[in-house]
Design a protein with these regions (language model features):
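Cysteine-nucleophile amide-bond enzymes
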Residues: 14-268
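Short, small-residue-biased leader/transition segments that mark boundaries at the very start
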Residues: 1-13
Length: 268
């Protein structure tokens, strides 16, 4: 007898499970269950202390502004829209001139034990808001702050709109670092020419594997919330980032591009 008849139901079953998972789902971690779930996924790949620090930042944010329609349990992910004005006024009422944390601060908090950071000179000119937040929120000690500034240093580049050339500069810079294979840093790199041509990590988050795909964790901006998004594949996550940040450019500038750890992700 042929093995095919027995195989058939499995493949259809697999397909239907797979189909269900294709659509991304997201949470703002505004519930115990979602935060615990994400925490346990992150803990498989990251230092406990890092995950604890991150969890505390999430709790502080959601306890302060969670009432502004932030989601708890994972729900189908489409374009999200947040009431930044309302969030800002709630945040400021509680925290005064500490503006909170952003994508870079949270990514460093999670990955700091997992990336070997070279002791090289950094250009932290564009990190002025981050530095103000780190200072007012007493977020990092001097060593962490120095490493943070090296990881997200501005990188010199040329006056061109050719992404390949910029990506090469970024890859060369990140060759000095050792990244983690499992807990990956996904960055959206932006070309800037206000003060000479340079590259800058305009947005960043952490991608980890799950049993049936990937989990991407990000804090959108200082004001905007945390998002944990479940994707079926890395490529889906790259696409999300490429689409969301495609307008972070200007006349004569290259379009933003994605780095996965130290490597350029060529989307073309």
């Amino acid at each position: 007898s042929t093995p095919y008849p027995t195989l058939f139901p499995y493949t259809t079953l697999f397909r239907s499970i797979h189909k269900k998972e294709e659509k991304p789902s997201y949470s703002n971690l505004n519930s115990k269950a979602s935060l615990n779930e994400v925490r346990s996924i992150l803990s498989k790949h990251l230092d406990k202390g890092s995950v604890d620090n991150f969890t505390n930042l999430v709790r502080d944010y959601n306890d302060t502004v969670g009432s502004v329609g932030l989601s708890g349990d994972f729900a189908p992910f489409s374009k999200t829209d947040y009431d930044v004005e309302k969030i800002s006024s709630l945040w400021t009422a509680k925290h005064g001139d500490f503006i909170g944390t952003n994508c870079r601060i949270n990514t460093y908090t999670l990955l700091k034990g997992k990336i070997k950071i070279p002791q090289v000179k950094s250009d932290s000119e564009l990190l002025f808001q981050d530095k103000d937040a780190i200072d007012k929120g007493k977020l990092f000690d001097a060593k962490d702050q120095a490493d943070f500034e090296i990881l997200f240093s501005r990188v010199k580049t040329e006056a061109t709109q050719d992404v390949k050339i910029h990506a090469k500069h970024m890859e060369d810079y990140y060759k000095q670092f050792t990244f983690d294979d499992k807990a990956r840093m996904l960055s959206v790199v932006v070309h800037d020419n206000l003060d000479g041509d340079s590259l800058f990590v305009g947005h960043v988050g952490v991608l980890v594997p799950t049993t049936d795909g990937y989990l991407f964790v990000e804090k959108l901006t200082f004001e905007e919330p945390y998002q944990a998004i479940k994707f079926a594949s890395k490529k889906d996550c790259y696409k999300y980032l490429t689409t969301k940040y495609k307008d972070y450019t200007g006349p004569g500038l290259a379009k933003p591009f994605i780095m996965d750890n130290g490597k350029w992700v060529d989307m073309d």
